[in-house]
Regions:
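N-terminal entrance/gating region of PLP-dependent enzymes' catalytic architecture
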Residues: 1-129, 418-424, 441-443, 447, ...
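Short amphipathic alpha-helices in soluble, non-transmembrane regions
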Residues: 404-414, 452-460
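PLP-dependent enzyme catalytic core of the Aspartate aminotransferase-like
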Residues: 428-495
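Conserved PLP-binding active-site segment of the aspartate aminotransferase-like
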Residues: 382-395, 400, 419-454
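Conserved PLP-enzyme active-site core in the AAT-like
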Residues: 141-298
Length: 495
């Protein structure tokens, strides 16, 4: 194992060196061709041996990877994992416990129980019956939250439950309602990217007292905005509706004593989604669903004689099958436990604060840049939307489609060249028109605003070259490198 691990680390380094940036150059077709060449044949008549196969496959993956440890990779809620978390994940793979029965995961089950109790207390510090389960991420957490709401309604003799979501809600909520056979969710109006309490009041009033679940968002995907949770909770309670908060992005703000007040009111929700593979720096997957009352998780319980026979449970063997909608389940909790124990609440909170502060400083850099402008309003949790002034000039000359086309072209060209990975979002501008923006989602726990400024120069230079074609004069000199980091395990994994 040690020898193979060394091979894998060498392959990661060699692949990253060959890539040379945050993303492989050439676009989808070239990347696919290079990757296939490096791993072929996938199923030879005679194998090449463990070390050669491992090196070839890992090097191919690294050479063709999007590297979130590079500050210029800032498109998505896609964090660079902490080295200690990646190392713990290696141990999880080596031990290979399956979390569906005690006889497959004796110690891992105890670790999960201890960790989920703490993760529940992060959300519900005053609730004596709070609990949490580990999920594969926000999509699964939201699905389970809606499932539990449906089961609670049916236990009260109701046929179903009506879900209400903001225009800003993550698509997984509507998909969960579809999967569960629930009525099509009612969409509640938003203003400036946040759900309007008055609009929620009108929507709930129209239901005439039918059972309802309001899904608020704490950290929208496009902008990192937080719904007005106290007001939404008050409106929901006035109609006897339940509240679920999708805090897949924003939930880890609760680790910071300074930032936790941004989520005031979240404790009034019956359930809360939050991810640790976003603002938590865990390898995917590391999701959490916290519930205010653990008895609601009873809806997940079932019997399978080979896993949790009645007599085994009565004899004292723990029943793990009701801790997930999955059966076979890897011990994702090991990396979470390692990180929480290593950093403590203050350490995790400090990293969250760093990302939030970096986003604020990055937004200030955009505001000072003569060729760029930021979307009006405060930056989201750690998300900044901006676009080149050259796009606005095209709007004046040829309309909104021309301006948006320039923004899209800048993003795609930088992707194809492997220079930068920026996201895209459609959001309302100061004049009420919805326009396309470049999106920087800043989750690097060590990067600074100075490390990120080259992104702005890349965008500005490309906007100039596309709006007014001329020979390229910039590009190669704008790559930023992070300063060396100190502290074993606190560094992120660079691929």
């Amino acid at each position: 194992m040690r020898a193979l691990t060394s091979v894998a680390l060498d392959a990661l380094a060699d692949g990253a060196a060959a890539r040379g940036g945050p993303l492989p150059h050439g676009g989808p077709d070239e990347v696919a061709a290079r990757t296939r060449a490096l791993i072929s044949p996938v199923l030879p008549e005679e194998g090449v041996g463990a070390q050669d196969a491992l090196y070839d496959v890992v090097r191919a993956a690294a050479q063709g990877a999007a590297d979130p440890s590079d500050p210029r990779c800032a498109a998505h809620l896609h964090c660079p994992p902490l080295a200690m978390a990646a190392a713990a994940d290696l141990a999880a793979s080596a031990l290979n416990p399956s979390m569906d029965s005690w006889d497959q995961a004796p110690a891992a089950a105890v670790i999960e129980e201890a960790v989920t109790a703490e993760l529940a207390r992060v959300v519900y510090p005053e609730a004596e019956a709070a609990d949490a389960i580990v999920t594969s991420g926000g999509t699964e957490s939201n699905l389970v939250a809606l499932l539990l709401a449906r089961e609670r309604a049916q236990a009260r003799g109701e046929r179903t439950v009506q879900v209400l979501v903001g225009e800003n809600a993550h698509h997984s909520v509507r998909r969960a309602a579809w999967i569960l056979g629930l009525p099509t969710p009612i969409t509640v109006d938003c203003r400036a990217g946040r759900m309007l309490p008055a609009a929620l009041d009108r929507a709930l009033a129209s239901l005439g007292g039918a059972p309802a679940l309001v899904v608020a968002t704490a950290g929208t995907t496009d902008e990192g905005l937080i719904d007005p949770l106290p007001q939404l909770a008050e409106v929901a309670a006035g109609f006897g509706a339940e509240l679920h908060v999708d805090a897949a992005y924003g939930g880890p703000l609760l680790f910071s004593r300074d930032l936790a007040p941004l989520l005031h009111g979240i404790e009034q929700a019956v359930s809360v989604t939050y991810d640790l593979h976003k603002l938590g720096w865990q390898p995917v997957a590391a999701g959490v669903l916290a519930v205010r009352d653990r008895t609601s998780l009873g809806a997940l319980s079932l019997r399978a004689d080979y896993l949790n026979a009645d007599d085994d449970t009565e004899a004292g063997l723990p029943d793990l099958l009701g801790r997930s909608i999955r059966t076979s389940r890897r011990p994702d909790v090991l990396k979470i436990a390692t990180t929480l124990r290593a950093l403590g609440r203050e350490g995790v909170g400090g990293l969250v604060e760093h990302c939030v502060d970096t986003a604020r400083r990055f937004a200030e850099s955009v505001d000072r840049h003569p060729a760029l402008r930021r979307r009006d309003g405060d930056a989201g949790i750690s998300t900044v939307l901006f676009r080149p002034l050259a796009a606005d000039a095209l709007v004046d000359e040829a309309g909104d489609e021309a301006g948006d086309a320039l923004v899209a072209a800048i993003r795609r060209e930088l992707l194809a060249e492997g220079r930068a990975v920026l996201g895209r979002a459609v959001a309302e501008d100061h004049d009420g028109v919805r326009r396309l923006w470049l999106k920087a989602t800043l989750l690097h726990p060590r990067a600074t605003a100075d490390d990120l400024r080259p992104l702005l120069e890349l965008v500005a230079e490309r906007a100039r070259s596309l709006a007014e074609p001329q020979p390229a004069t910039a590009g190669d000199a704008v790559a930023a490198t992070l300063p060396g980091q100190q502290g074993a395990g606190l560094e992120t994994v660079s691929v």
